[in-house]
Amino acid sequence: NYRKDNLEAPEIMYQPELGKYYLFTSYDPLMTTYNVRVAYSDFPEGPFVDFYGEDIKDTTNNVPILTAPYRFENHPGWAGTAHCGLIDAGDGRYFMVHQGRLSPQNQLMDLHVREVFFTVNGWPVVSPERYAGTAPRSFTKEDLVGEWEIIRIQEPPLERSLEAGQILWGEGDLRNGEQALSARVVLEADGSVGDATWDFNVKKQLLTIKT
């Protein structure tokens, strides 16, 4: 966990329906590739394990990653998307708040709010865009037909020279490859998407793409 010399901002949340404690932590330099990761445990004192069952107290590089620098089209994008807090809305919904820095200079810090959802195997994921207070609704397969932008959140590929866990003075801009960029895909009505196929489970509201 110390491969990039910065690991901080722990936050623990209990999810009573799943009976799990979730530990959210922030990795990497706060102005650039700052990102949130999560692990879970049956007990608040741990041990906490990652997606692959690895104890996060080890020095491996743990996943899953919930937020990392990203950019959709027609927007300059965000960096420094970490240092989170968790909110229990009291009605079965959960939200994550964290900082975000407007690219490309990454100087202006803004507050991001994202809704937290849980996968069928008990892992939290967050909304790809900031929460806008819209009412929840269900979708049909027909609703999803059309062109979409998809972003894959993944490990920042570059290693920086750091000082006290932070980037060196004057190196606050993101470098090539450090920001996840959106790619356009078209979900066709016949269930194809490029060379792959897609399907949508209406009951679970779950989109599946098979390559």
Where are these regions (language model features)?
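Carbohydrate-active catalytic/glycan-binding domains of CAZyme proteins
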Residues: N1-T211
